[in-house]
Amino acid sequence: MENQIQPKAEVAKLELEAVIGFNGHVPTGLKCHPDQEHLIYPLGCTILIQAIKTQEQNFLHGHSNNVSCVTISKSGVYIASGQVTFMGFKADIILWDYKKRELMARLSLHKGKIEALAFSPNDLYLVSLGGPDDGSVVVWSIAKTEAICGSPAAGLNVGNATSVVFSQCHDEMFVTAGNGTIRVWELDLPNRKIWPTECQTGQMKRIVMSISMASDDSFFYLGTTTGDILKMNPRTKLLADTGPAKDKFSLGVSAIKCLKTGGLLVGSGAGLLVFCRSPSYKPIKKIQLQGGITSISLRGEGHQFFVGTEESHIYRVNFTDFKETLVTTCHFEAVEDVVFPFGTAELFATCAKKDIRVWHTLSNRELLRITVPNMTCHGIDFMRDGKSLISAWDDGKIRAFAPETGRLMYVISNAHRIGVTAVATTSDCTRVISGGGEGEVRVWQIGHQTQKLEEALKEHKSSVSCIRVKKNNEECVTASTDGTCIIWDLVRLRRNQMILANTLFQCVCYHPEEFQIITSGTDRKIAYWEVFDGSGIRELDGSLSGSINGMDITPEGVHFVTGGNDHLVKVWDYNEGEVTHVGVGHSGNITRVRISPGNEYIVSVSADGAILRWKYPFPS
């Protein structure tokens, strides 16, 4: 009997064209490759290799969970990356071949999390530190891709080791440091052992955040949470000096880099980038950047270097004039919505906590940023004429901005009691329909200078998650997390039809012929409904695991796209109800997905701040 079951047809893969995103929270996650042409950085469970000049991107897929550390060998031949996993499970280290852009080996020994990685100067060994639940340090042979030896990383009476650096000249020495522990290790290869020596810092108790070795191994420098720098001698294991005595770096020294000339580049948790020298450590040059600095990576000898911050900014800094240029930026919080202007795929807007951003589609460049401090924007929509961008905020206000300049045009205060959760506009640009956290749907008349409430439609019992308007502006449908979808008559301003289901509806779409709607939500089902009488037509299993949060349909109504908590973008055939293509690449829950006008791209956004652009799989 079992032999007769036909295997399912192979589902095609969506082609990933570009990623806008950078996880700035990974310590020393941003790396400049020794070929000086590429930046390497993590985003969720993928690693991006981006050409500095052409912005061309390659992706390394292989981790099953978020990447927690990245390192590159001195020769540039290998990349190693570690990941986080669940408590008690093995966390993988992956060794990549840089030239071929492919996985070479999976090194699995640590549990829970890989804290830090470092290559030896001649590419012989890789050293790895396990996370707080693991607490061990392991040396791996790169030639044999197997572990040589391991040991507990820190003593019994001190905290965890969190950073590691290899000697610049010898393959047999490395340093680990962390909470109250600084150790110099010697590798004894014939006996397959590593011998630690605890470094003496006297009365000073420090938690080390960052570490860097001088190019001749004469000293290594440690940045601490206290905001000062320790200079240690690896031969004598003694403290050489510390500083600055006054004006310590605010929020700790989160990144540190030795230069060949003998100076230090120091990045603080408050976003201050400083060039200083031992023993005074007084700033010689300094600039203020946005977000705490987590990575400093030199291009070549350090005539130019790249800086990564927690707010997902990547800066390029020339050493001589010490001026910063923003290279890449993206959202560092969950992206709530994405929308294209009517009739053009050249640009699109996204919104998240604190800001709305407008992006140029082909170059991935940020064209405009509109910031409203300490507020979250839940939804956006362009007016059909392109003169205003309407946004829904959690402080209960609807704000309209000019899309070219970001100028605030008007605010509708107290639009909803518990924040505005969804917003839509009519094609004649005279009305805005908004939904709130308390479940009200409100219709606003927008004049030249006035914004007037036409009607408050009170039916939903919980927050409104999605609003779609019919082409003739006489009807709209609202989806709510109370398990109802309501079709409203926008002429009589009354309810036409109500759809009930045992789910929290997250998204709804009109079929272009507007006699059917499709809905989806937390029950993972995609349901088709008749608009006329609200009866169910069919139901599909949209996902095997997790809610479906975003949905969009093509203007022809032949295909539609969904995305949700299974991190997959799926393209469906509307009539057949079959998945035709699947896009793998997100590492956070997908919150919204859109098909661009003209069916060129699919843009999906996720809870980890990433924006992914996919090639639309069918000829438009």
From Swiss-Prot:
This is Cilia- and flagella-associated protein 52. Keywords: Cell projection, Cilium, Cytoplasm, Cytoskeleton, Flagellum, Phosphoprotein, Repeat, WD repeat. Belongs to the CFAP52 family. The keyword DNA-binding does not apply. Microtubule inner protein component of sperm flagellar doublet microtubules. Interacts with BRCA2. Interacts with the CCT chaperonin complex. Interacts with HSP70. Interacts with AK8. Interacts with CFAP45. Interacts with DNAI1. Interacts with IQDC. The keyword Cytoplasm applies. PANTHER family: CILIA- AND FLAGELLA-ASSOCIATED PROTEIN 52, WD-40 REPEAT PROTEIN. It is found in: Cytoplasm; Cytoplasm, Cytoskeleton, Cilium axoneme; Cytoplasm, Cytoskeleton, Flagellum axoneme. WD repeats lie at residues 62-106, 109-150, 156-195, 203-242, 288-327, 330-369, 372-411, 415-454, 459-498, 500-539, 543-582, 585-620. One of its GO terms (biological process) is gene expression. Pfam families: WD40. GO terms for cellular component: 9+2 motile cilium; axonemal B tubule inner sheath; axonemal microtubule; axoneme; sperm flagellum; sperm midpiece. It comes from Sus scrofa. Its main location: cytoplasm. Microtubule inner protein (MIP) part of the dynein-decorated doublet microtubules (DMTs) in cilia axoneme. Important for proper ciliary and flagellar beating. May act in cooperation with CFAP45 and axonemal dynein subunit DNAH11. May play a role in cell growth and/or survival. SMART domains: WD40. Expressed in respiratory cells and sperm (at protein level). It comes from the Eukaryota.
